Amino acid sequence: MANVSIHGPTGVLVVDGQKVFPIGLSDPPPHDGQAPSGEHAFRELANGGATMIRTGTPNWALGRINQQIAKEKTIQDSAAAHGLQCWMRLGPAADLPGAAANAQILQKVVTAFKDHPALCAYKGIDEPRNPFRGAKWIRPAGLVRAHTRIKALDPKHPLVIIQAPRGPVSQLVPYRPAFDITGVDIFPIAYPPGLHSDNGNPDISVVGDMAYKMDEASGGKPFWMTLQIAWSGVAPSKAAPDLVPRFPTLKQERFMAYQAIVHGARGLIFFGGHLTEVCTPDDAKAGWNWTFWRQVLRPVVHELTSSQLRPALLVPNAKILVRTKPHSEVELAVRRAGKFLYVIAVKRGGSTLLVELLGLPKRQNGAPLTKGEVLFEYVQRPLPPPPRPDRQVPRPIKVSGGGFRDWFSPYDVHVYRFDLS
């Protein structure tokens, strides 16, 4: 059994005593599938940095509960064997009293998996306050009762409720007692853009807007952001035959992930790899969008889980006021981990600017900072010519008077690291 709790100062998960910034895939490849590399599908994801997958079913039914539990156990066994954990859907059963069988289903499912080594967290009813539910939106009271019951059955795994990117914060506040972690789905890329949310921002920077909204709605509890691989708004169907497939580029996905982190997200979920109707023929046969994983998602996840950056995702925001001059659309998060200070900077949009960042502290010995580095951006030192392939280092930054200048184009991400020792 994995003992999973929430780290109070940060909101990240603590899994068997180790802090984890969860990176999940919803839904994953088939549990018995194979990646194009030849690896087991789940092992490929774990090796690439993913920590968990969404599992479970949205329609647990008492009449076939034993078969459903057996199927879920096979998936969780495979996840555990290949280095992944599971975020298990409870579906409508996580609403009490709800349907007559809900309480029985909830007890059977939670009891069946609460001691499974792959279980990471439970997923409550999806988007309970989505305006598209109309008058049938899910009232908080039943979800609060379900949360209480789940915690009585299994106090060692959190319950997560993800909301829709629509409606005011005031509609989400009543759900606070119903979850341990909340979050939001936000899929801004489509033709035309901006269809998924209702806040009027058609740009990919709507991710930051939604993160800000969930930070307010959460009441101090942690939140995750569910970001786009694909979604129903880019997948043609009989009901919407004229939709045109569209996916985030590497730059867009990287920006959305880092902007979510800058605005406080303590976990990221990537949705839509299982929508085979918009995959290549080979990926459709394999049951998952391995092309997107290879070209876009794996490079982003590799950065987030790297030894250079990972420590910064597991600590609170530092109480250091780093600011930009002139005022720009650059958004910042400042973290202190060990001897390093991290400044994660993203540019929402606008024009290309040379931006000054000010407010860096002195080193631990009182001496001023004179240099830093930009992670994941590489240059040769000493400078060429001649080219020396064995001399690539992170791009250096010169610091003077507690500040430095750097270029930002729209949707740029720069991850700065400074050695304070």
Regions found by a protein language model. Give the residues of each.
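Aromatic-lined carbohydrate-recognition surfaces of secreted/lumenal glycan-active proteins
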Residues: 87-95, 144-170, 218-234, 270-273
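Aromatic-lined substrate-binding rim segments of carbohydrate-active enzymes
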Residues: 37-110, 135-160, 198-207
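Aromatic/acidic polysaccharide-binding cleft in carbohydrate-active enzymes
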Residues: 241-300
